[in-house]
Amino acid sequence: MDRGKTMKLYIELVPETCWYENLRKVLSKKEWDKIRIDVYAKANHKCEICGASGKLNCHEFWEYDDKNAIQYLKGFQALCDSCHNIKHIGFVNVQISKGIWPKKVLDDLAKHFMKVNNVGLNEFNQHVKKAFDVWRERSKKKWKTDLGNFNKESTQKTLF
């Protein structure tokens, strides 16, 4: 995916074979909370995409080396629930299919995406299709995860 160079908000589907492979998994709650709180403070406690205030999520963003099947952790973003759920719209679909979330959530997210990016429903649907096409291809591979400068050892040095 082009990391949304022409859009402020774009979908980032993590390949199924990488689910739960993230920094949060290897850190203690205290260590993760330190990172999360720092990310929120640097963003002035606002969503870094749409500017909303209120509850935030610390989103890990990744870069993918498709040739060598390596996912690289590149950093973090403070995101509101709507922007974060668009990033992980596949998870939203799972929650809806299980009956945990109402279908209306998807409609609300589409409206949020269109508003933030100033695009129509057709562009939203095209973006969703492209994101899932990339996800399907990437999910066929077994990926290595590279936490880079955010690995547990280097993170502990900066936290304590």
Task: Place the predicted regions along the sequence by residue.
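DNA major-groove recognition helix of helix-turn-helix/homeodomain DNA-binding modules
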Residues: 81-83
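Hydrophobic alpha-helical segments, principally membrane-spanning helices and signal/leader peptides
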Residues: 13, 44-45
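A boundary/linker detector
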Residues: 1-35, 52-54, 99-160
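Histidine-centered nuclease catalytic patch
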Residues: 36, 40, 46-78, 87-98
